[in-house]
Regions:
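Hydrophobic alpha-helical segments
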Residues: 1-194
Length: 194
């Protein structure tokens, strides 16, 4: 058996994407994502197509729950993007950025996300939240002073929403990283559609 090279692992998913699903429901899901994104997403072809439909519906449910959050859509995407950057999930970085482009959000702010702590595009409240997100994601622990600084800017509900975003983004990140799923170049597709 051949051992995969580093290049092969970077380019190919660990499981071969299923291009033609068997079930009628999954064929419909493929068609809907092709319509929504301009292509069938790799996580769908690699993971969801191999699992009972309810598992794919769970990922969809996360997106629906995000719409019930009181945080601004920009803050939601900034948090998700930041977690994806820390975890190095190329697919999640790409899809998050494509959502930001589609919503005409400030791309310069997303470009500056790695320097949020010093960049004037970010408010003190955003910096406090992103410091919290950084510690929670990277260290799996948060210092009391980091929490206190964040809680000066956010309600208890908003704090719980921030924790939800970090936890649910980990689900997406680990699912994609675990199957070697990389960028689907969704930003390019989104920019062409605008």
């Amino acid at each position: 058996m051949n051992t995969p090279t580093e290049w092969t692992l970077k380019v190919h998913t660990f499981l071969i994407p299923i291009e033609k699903p068997e079930g009628l429901m999954m064929k419909l899901v493929y068609a809907l994502t092709r319509w929504q994104f301009g292509k069938v997403l790799t996580p769908l072809k690699v993971m969801s197509a191999r699992m009972p439909l309810a598992f794919g519906m769970f990922a969809s449910k996360i997106s629906k729950l995000d719409k019930k959050l009181t945080l601004s859509p920009e803050m939601i995407l900034l948090i998700r993007e930041h977690v994806a950057h820390i975890n190095i999930c190329e697919f999640c970085i790409d899809i998050g950025r494509s959502f930001a482009i589609k919503a005409s959000m400030n791309e310069a702010k997303f470009d500056a996300l790695e320097e949020y702590d010093t960049n004037p595009l970010f408010t003190e409240a955003e910096r406090a939240a992103l410091d919290y997100v950084t510690e929670l994601t990277r260290d799996k622990n948060v210092r009391p002073e980091t929490f206190t600084r964040m809680s000066a800017h956010y309600s208890e509900r908003a704090i719980c929403e921030i924790v939800w975003l970090v936890a649910s983004e980990h689900f997406y990140n680990i699912s994609n990283i675990g199957l070697n799923i990389h960028s689907d170049m969704l930003c390019d597709i989104t920019k062409r559609k605008k």
